[in-house]
Amino acid sequence: MEQKENLKNLLLSYFSLFTENINELGKAKSIKHSIHTTQLPDVMPMRRTPERLRLVVKKKIEDMLRNNIIRPSTSPFACPILLVAKKEEGQMRFCVDYRPLNNVTVKDRYPIPNIQLIIDSLHGAKYFSTLDLLSGYWQIEIEEKHKYKTAFICEYGLYEFNCMPFGLCNAPSTFQREMNTLFKDVLYEFVLVYLDDIIVFSKTRDEHIRHLRIVFDLLTKENLKLKLSKCDFFKTKIKIPRTYYYS
């Protein structure tokens, strides 16, 4: 009972850190995504969206424009879009086929954590919390001079991203670099980050509250937002990214 009360008070004290609304997305203060290319990408033709899905595309475009995720473009770059079914939610995910752009992008070799290293770091911990950033990639802006390279084409026009979309080959490296830099003083001590999955781990209840407070403080200072409905607190068993379980 005391544990629940302590957690409730902690969450209330960081109320502004949490949101479920895209129009309240945070914007990382210390990093922006760059796209360095060697040449213009090959041009792929615009894909025809099935008639039954056109309203889905139209609504997604309107939502992203309204929330400043994208803007109209006059770019010479133009990658086609595609819709991918979300198995768990029964919805469609709006994606851009960035293969032409990725083929001419200079690769960022920043390392992604090894799963075994994550498992080894959790040894001895008894309490776990998993934190989910609301549309984490979108909380990192694109460098202004590189936004035109993210342009995509569809029946409703040509647009480019203001923030980092899925599908860019270097997006995982940029995001991992941001997380590792943000948590550099506590990484592997009581925080693990695998791309957009944040794990806080501790040996005692009191220690876990203290660790969560430190993490919340760092996220707040960096102007990032968590999605409360996707966060889990004080678990004794968690699913580690890429299907591994730990308890």
Segments and roles (model prediction):
Residues N67, G124-A125, E189, E222:
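Structured helix-beta-strand junction loops
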Residues E2-N9, G26, R52-K59, P76, ...:
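Generic recognition of stable, solvent-exposed alpha-helical segments in well-folded globular domains
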Residues T19, R66, K184, T220-K221:
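Residues at helix-coil transition
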Residues M1-Y110, E189-L195, V200-S202, R242:
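Reverse-transcribing Pol proteins
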Residues S16-V43, V84-R93, D108-Y110, D120-L122, ...:
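Reverse-transcriptase-like RNA-dependent polymerase core
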Residues T74-V106, L131-Q139, N170, D197-S247:
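Acidic, metal-ion-coordinating active-site neighborhood of RNase H-like domains
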